[in-house]
Regions:
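Acidic, S/T/G-rich, low-cysteine, solvent-exposed domains in lumenal/extracellular/periplasmic regions
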Residues: 1-173
Length: 173
């Protein structure tokens, strides 16, 4: 939550967007909104295939930070919280109801980004040059609740390569 991202302790399923010949935890995630990362996917109505994904949504973002949902399930999707009995998946009152967010982009402009305790504790490399007095650099972050979308087995499918390329382009812009 320090960066405005909330990752759920669940596995997302979506009976309304299953991938043929795959089990319930492999699904088509739809692009959400007009963010530059997903704009072309939304316009073309192309989904991204994810497998064993966790929910990833906007949490409490630090002041001056913007968080936008990139991918989500249909309204039929849910975040299954009973991870012990995944073979018998069924929606119950403990599950996160759909549409379930699956990816988020977070950014903060220069001078508004706030150093966090997490950032300060994880300085393993030599420190970067200090910004000018009172100035903080802009930063961007993309979090996807699934790493399989970018692996060899799924990367060539559907909108997966577009999502990956657009995310890198946005991060480097």
């Amino acid at each position: 939550d320090a960066y405005g991202v909330r990752v759920g302790a669940n596995i997302v399923v979506d009976p309304g967007a299953t991938v043929p010949l795959y089990s319930a935890e492999t699904l088509f995630a739809g692009a959400s909104g007009t963010h530059p990362i997903v704009r072309s996917l939304e316009q073309a109505k192309v989904g991204v295939i994810v497998a064993l994904a966790r929910s990833v949504g906007a949490g409490r973002a630090p002041e001056g930070t913007t968080a936008q949902i990139l991918l989500e399930t249909t309204a039929e999707g849910w975040g299954e919280t009973d991870l012990v009995h995944l073979r018998a998946v069924a929606r119950d009152g403990n599950d996160l109801t759909g549409p379930v967010p699956l990816a988020v982009a977070v950014s903060a402009p220069a001078n508004e980004a706030q150093a966090t305790e997490v950032e300060e504790q994880q300085l393993a490399d030599p420190p970067a040059p200090k910004p000018l007095a009172g100035e903080r650099p802009a930063w961007r972050l993309v979090v996807v609740g699934d790493s399989d979308f970018a692996t060899n087995s799924l990367l060539a499918l559907s909108g997966n390569p577009t999502l990956l390329a657009n995310a890198f382009n946005w991060l480097l812009d």
